[in-house]
Each structure stands twice: as structure tokens, then as C-alpha cells.
């Protein structure tokens, strides 16, 4: 394994290196590691991964590792099934092509091996080994060779097909590839005759189709509701049907027919006529092979009707041939049994009937056909008149004419025509035996109506195309299945018909030509015949009575007709109108259903596209994020790897790295590695210093002295050795010089001896040249000719090669141009997608900016409203101050209590105190109270400004504005109400308080709301509010100038003291305010009704009159309680004040 995770291109390069050195398993492991690594799955495009995938699959095919190829294909599908489907398709097709090529090569190799074995020894072909092997296993040499060489590759190819089908079965982008691979698998089964694999393949495809039908209502994946999917599935099943018929697997063919019928029934569009014709043709073939001649004829009849109605270029010869085929198939149907065996013995079993009904559904028939119904349909379509002259009388001979003596001869002529006819009539040959059996049965029935007994020899003469055994078998079968009364006498060699008078043939008349009834039939119908004869006799004896009855009946019928003709006519017209309305209604319903279905499908498609687009965007973002992370990680790893390589070049670096494992190195970065390197260097330097110091200590004085004594001896030895070496060299050099002089002398003497041979050498060379001159010239001439031929050949080859090179260069240019255009198209599509994404981003930003602007606008409006409310509040405060000054001036006068009107009750009557003169509080007290009120008002503003701003916005400001515009008593709440102690209070010793006690003037510590006029403005006893004073004034009955009684005044409660002893309303505000907040209290205060129109309460003026209110209380306000009990403490005792 590699030390670090390799990049795909590096892995491919390393895999090629492994392949070159003959290690494919190592190469496959290297490539497989790339696909298993999740880091690289989505970081590279298909241009990088696709070559690696081809190499990976090539190695899997070479090594027959189908399970490893499956793993890689599934990983590749997950990576590129939504990015580039063409790449996935190319990879799968290339993988299957490689597997097929290797399988074909193995087949050729197996055949070649068998051929070599057969040609090994021509004299002894059957060797003892081959004889023993054939005796043991029963196989020949080809089978054994295929099992050894071919079978492993066939198994690998089959597994490859199954893996690819499983890979693509739910991928909506690869439906075409899925069905192409299914057809390739069918061809594989046909080529190698793999019947068991074909059955498993059919089951697998049927399971896939069932899964698609179950999940058809999902928004993703393959949907069977799509027209394209239905057509692809139908074409694949038709191909499956053809393959099953070729392999003679009739059970699989029948299942394929059921699947085809289900797909055609599921489709909303009518199949094309060509498909239906192919379907009926294959269905007729399957019924023929199954021996079901009835449904075989019915399928051929449906095919004939379809071809005759829809095929425009149908020739007369084709029509005659098809008509003859249908006629012979229909007439060859065996005669039906009067009492079938399942009716006799298995009467409760409905399986045969259900099976027939199921087969009829495959043909599109409402009920199972019968021989009589098919013959009737053949006659209706005028098929007997459309056939050629040879078959035109066949229907009359078998079904109409009664001629038992010549029946078999006539049928034999038709049989001879079929057998000796052209090749076109070969399709009719399978019907000959069935036609003969039907003819024999017709002959036996007709003979039984003419003769009571007949000899075997005579019957065999009439039935010319069967022998005695076949005839006897047919007689027994006719008795068994058709309830014919036949008795065979083998002693007399004759046959008896209808001799038993106790049995009847059937309850209905038999089909086919008849001459007379059988004796048993005559016995059964004797009473019927007697009734017929008697009826005829009565009509002869009384001819007029029957005529009168008929005339009377005719008159009644005419009279009845005239009575009901108008009603019936209207009913018929109404029925026609009802039918038309019903048709229109059904048509509208169908149109509405189709539109709804189209809308639903469009909506589902739109949702699916949106979901798919969103998912693709998310995946794209995820891939970009992972790619960015992988790039950062790769940069880090690259720098780390470079740093490690740099450090490993030094000795201390190797030593430091040897102490770390791979995981430890991966956890470190470059800085940490450099730091450890520096630490290692420092540690080694310290160790070296310590070693040097320890060695220095070990060297002693004796060692140094010994070496000093050795120095002169070494110098003397070297001097003597130098002298000896010089003497040896001089002796050696003298010897070499002497040897060289001797060798020179010997060489000169040898040369002098050889100079005498020069003339002989020259003569020999001249003679040799003269002898071989002609041979040399001949060879030169041949060489020149061969050279010229070779030159011309090479020139021609060079011309052809250059032409081919130019053609290949042109093709490469075209291919490069095509690839360049495809790349440009892809880049343009990518640019469009990026532009669309950018447009969506800009649109989202515009929407955000629009919402931000709306928010700023709304915020500006709220600030403007708050500013206006603040201005109104300041203006109202100024007006209150002015009105307070005016009210203080009006109260500066003394007023006797006896000056009140007579109609107003006295304070003593209401409160139980003595009648006396009371005067208001001194000016100083009023000033104190005014200052307290101002102080309290400020506290109220400080305390409830934020809370009252919403109430002002909702109720107060608008109501004040309306009052000002209407010109009403807008300043009524500004008039300072006189204290209850000055208007209707009792004397200090026995006075009470009406409508709530006033606080003491000495209560300088009290907060806002203690005084009645301040509470009216800031707090109504249920929470601070503004703008609601008019409603509160209505509750109190309005302001009064004099001391008259208030209209809503309650009976005063005795407190046992003066007005100071009365409980203050503001002493316990928390108890007065219930759970639910200030808004509910304000709503309840607003709901309070004012004084009735025109009722001033005695003594009020226009300033104190409340403004009229038009709004009505809401349901929420009406449901809330009108009374509330507030409790507050005063002077050590508990009192209860009930407010309305």
C-alpha cells in the first residue's frame, strides 16, 4: 500500500507501472484504493476519473474479478449519474464489450484446442484416453474443452450482465442503456444456449418491472406512467418473447405474453398496428406449440382482422395466403366434446374455465371462444371466398354438405395440394393431421345417420387416409367424448350405430351437416313431435278460430300501439337525449380527468424538477466545499511530504523520522517537524560533546609516550624500504630492454624469409580475379535489378502509407473538431447554468433589498406616528396646565351648602352627616395638591410612557382628533372636578364619601393617581392610560358646576370619619388590576356607557358634556364583567369599594 493517499492521475500512472512489470493484482489494488477513498470521489471531473475507470475495469476483466468490478461501477454511478450520464454509459458499454471479447476469444481458443487434439494422430483418432473419458463422463472433447476454457468466461460475462442490470434498474437517466443491456443478455443466452440463465434473467426483469410499478407514484426514479418507459419495456418484452420462442422455452414465452398484455393495458395510448400484429403472431405460435388449437385459431383470426383493416398495401396473394391459414386453422379445431371430462368428474373445479377466460383476456375477447363461434366469425368475414381455388370448397365439404361417401376423397385432394404445393404452403402442413381427424369424425357422424351397421372394410374404404388402428381409436374417442352410440363387433368385423333406444345423444342439435335424427333422439323428442302434430291437426279442423284469434290479437295490438305510440315516441326521444347527455357527461368527465391527470403530472414533474435542481445545487455546493477542503489538505500534505523528504536526506533527519510512524507523521505539520528536527540536532550535539569529553579522559600519559618512541623506528623502516624498491625496479627495467631487442631481431629475420613469396601471391590473386570477374558482374546485375524492384515496391508502399497517414490525420482532425465542439457546447451549457444561478442569486438579493426597504419604510412610519403622539401629548399637557389654572380661579369663592337646588339630595341624606357650611380647602392646600398632581403626572409619564404609547396610538389620539374635528366638548375632561368633600360630603364628624374617598392633603408622599382629577387623566383604577378620560367621565356621570347629585352615584358607605378616612383608590393598584394586563382593563373602561343623550345630570355645561361615540362594543368587550371589587387599606382597617 502507498504511504500516502494517491491522487487519481498518480494512481493511474502507478497502476500502469505495475502492469508493465507483470503485477496486475497490485495495479488493481492501487486503483481500487482510489475509489474507496471518499476524498477524491467528488473532487475530480469525469475526464480524470474515466480513464482510471477503464483501466480498473480492464484489470477486473483480465483477472475475472466481477465482484470488484461491481463495486467500482456502483461507486462510479453514484459519482456521475447526475453529472454526466454519457460517461457512465461509455464505461458500462466498454466493460461489457471487453467481457464479450474475452469470452469470444475463449470460445475460439476452445475450438482450436479441440481441433489440435483431433489432428494430433490421424492414424489413431480414438485414443484409449478419449475412449475412457467418453465412457466415464459421456462428453466429447469439445464439451470438456468448453467446460475448462470457455465456461469461466461465460460465467463472468453472465455476472457482468446481471450487475449492470442491477446497477441501472432504478436510474431514470439510463433507461435506454438498461434495455439495451437486457437485449444483449438475451443474445448471450441465445448464442451460448444458456436456458437456465435465460429463465433467471426473465425472473429478474419481471421483478424489476414489479418494483417499478410499486414505486410509480414517487417523484423520483423510473415511473411506469411515462410513455417512453412503457414503450421501452414493451419493446424489451417483445424481444424476450422472440428469444424464448427461438430457444423453445414456451413457459417463459407465455409469461412474456402476459407481461406484454399488461403493459399494453396499462398504456393510455393504443399500441401501433405493427406491434399488435407481432403480438398476435407470437401468441398464435405459442398456442400452436402448446397444442391449444382453439386459441391458436382465434389468435390467427385476430391477426387477420387487424391486417385486413389497417394494412394499406396488402396484396391479393398475401390476403389469400392469410385467409387460407385462418380457414385451415379454424376447421382443424377438434370437434367439441358433449360432456368434457372435467364436467363429468370434476364438476366443482372451475380452474379449466378460469384458464380459458384468462387466455381469452390475452386475445382481447370478452369470453372464451368456441369452434362454432370461430366458424361463424370466419363466415361473417367472408374468409371462405377469399382463399384460393384449392381451398374454397373446404368449408362446404366439412360444415355444410352431407356426402359421407366422397368426403375423405375431397379432403385428400386438399391434403395433396398442401403437401405438393410451393414453399408458401409449408405453413399449412401442421394442420394436415388435425384436418384428417376432424374429417374422420365428420365421416363417422354422417355414417351413423345413414347406416345402422357397417363393415370395417367398407368404413376403411371410405376413410382412405387412416388404418384400422387409427380408425378404432377415433371410434373409441367419439364414444368417450361425443356421446355417440357405437358398438364394435370384432367377430363379424362390423360396427353398429344408435341401437340403444334408452339413451339420447344430446339435449341440443349437433353441429355440422345432418340428414336425420338418431333413433335415441327420436325417442327423446317423441312428445315434442306429438305436440307439433296435434297443433297442426287443430289448425286444420278449426281453421277460422285461429284466424279470428289472430285478428283479435292484431286489433288489440293496434289499439295498444295507438295508445302508447306518443308516449313511446317521447320516451325514445328522451332516451336519445339522455344517451347524448350521458355521452357528453362522460366525455366531460374524461376530459376533466385527463386535464387533472395532466396537471397533476405536470405539477409532480415541476416539483420533481425543483427538488432535483435543489438537490443538484446542494450537491454542487457540497462538492465545491469538499474540493476546497481537499485542495487545502493536499497542499498541506504536499508541503509536509516535501519537508519530510528534505529532512530524510540528513542522518539526523532519518533518525528522527525512524522514531515516528505514518500516523504520527500525518498528525504533524511542517513547523512541528522542523521543531523536532532542531531538537534532534541539539540533542545529538550534546551527546557528541559528552562523548568527546569521556574519550579525552580515557587517553593517558603512557599511550602518548609509547607512540613517541615508535616514531624513529617507523622512519628508519621506511628509508630502508625505499632503497630496496629502487634496486628492484632497476633490475626489472634492464631485463625488459633486453627482451625487446631480441624480439626485434627475430621479427626482421622472419620478414626477410617471407619476401620471396610476394610474386607467387600476386600471380594467384590475378588468376583468381580473372576467373570470378563474370560471376561478380552477374551478381552485380542481379543486385541492381533486385535493388530497382525493391526501390519501386518501397516507393509504392510509401505512397500508400502516406495516403493512409493523411486519411488518418484527416479523421483525427474531424474527431478533434467534434470533441472541441462538444466541449464548447458543454462549456456553453455550464456558462448558462452559472448565469442562471447568478440570476437566481441576484433575484434573491433584490427580494431581500425590497423587504429591507419595506421594513425601513414601515419603521419610518412608526417613528412618524410616535413623533405625532409625543407632540399631541405635549400639547395636551400644556392645555391641562392652562385649564388647571382657570379651574383654580373658579374655585376661589365661598359657597353655602343651602344654595343647592331642591331636587338634589343633601350630603347628610346621602352620607349620614350634619348639614353645615363647608368651604373648599385653602389655596395653599390646593397648590400643594396641584404640585403633587404635577409631580404625579410626571411619575406617570416616567412609569407608563412606553406602555401608554400603544394605547395612545390605538385609542386616545384618534379619539381626541375626532372630538376636535366634530367641535364637541373636547375639553370636558380638562375641567377640574371639585372634590367630593366640597360638593356632597357630610360634616367632618359624620360625613361619608361618594364614589370613592379622596386622599388627605397632607399626603405629600403619594404618587400619581391619588387624586380624582389626576386619576381621571392618567389612571382609571385599572392601569395607566391616555385618551380614555371621556369614557371615565361617562362612568361618573359627567362633570357638574354645582353640587347636584351624580346620576350614577352609589350610596355612600359610612367610614366613621371624615373624607380623609375614606380609602384611596390608588393605595392598592395591584389588587384592582386583574390578570390579563392593562389592555383588557382599558377595553372594559371604553365599554362603559356615558350619560344618556340630553341628560346633563343637572348643572353641567358644554365643556363637561361627553363627546358622542359611534363605535359599538365588540363581543370580547361585552363578554367581560362590568363590575370589579377593589380592596384597599386605610388607617388600620379593611374597606371594600365597589366600582361600576
Swiss-Prot record:
Keyword RNA-binding set for record: yes
Keyword Protein transport: no
Name of the protein: Eukaryotic translation initiation factor 3 subunit A
Chief localization: cytoplasm
Gene designation per UniProt: eIF3a
GO BP term, pick one: regulation of translational initiation
Domain PCI: 319-502
GO cellular component, one term: multi-eIF complex
